[in-house]
């Protein structure tokens, strides 16, 4: 649920959002007319998406549709699948927490924020 809200928020107030991150986000790409990925042309933000292995297995085309949408909007976005990490891998007290994957994801997040917001 969090991943879609980063896009919805950035599309609602694009002048106030310069960077967004989605870690183990789901439902970023749907067949519905209100799919978050369809709002990407409204954004002015750089993005980082860390996708869990099992989320990628459920929607193997989602990452490609995200890349296509960001490319068409001329916006920078890095999109990666975290092999071996399951949905929720960044939640430190969660059942599928993966410390190595979480630290890598947080490093990408901090790098993006430093690049765009500082």
Predicted regions and their residues:
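N-terminal cap/leader regions of alpha/beta-hydrolase-fold enzymes
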Residues: 1-118
């Amino acid at each position: 649920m969090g991943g879609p809200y980063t896009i919805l928020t950035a599309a609602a107030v694009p002048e106030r959002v310069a960077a967004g991150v989605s870690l183990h986000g789901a439902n970023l790409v749907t067949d519905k007319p209100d799919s978050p990925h369809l709002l990407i042309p409204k954004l002015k933000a750089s993005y980082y998406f860390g996708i869990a292995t099992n989320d990628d297995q459920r929607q193997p085309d989602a990452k490609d549709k995200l890349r296509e949408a960001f490319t068409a909007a001329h916006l920078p976005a890095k999109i990666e699948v975290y092999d071996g990490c399951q949905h929720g891998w960044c939640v430190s007290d969660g059942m599928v927490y993966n410390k190595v994957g979480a630290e890598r994801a947080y490093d990408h997040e901090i790098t993006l924020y430093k690049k765009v917001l500082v």
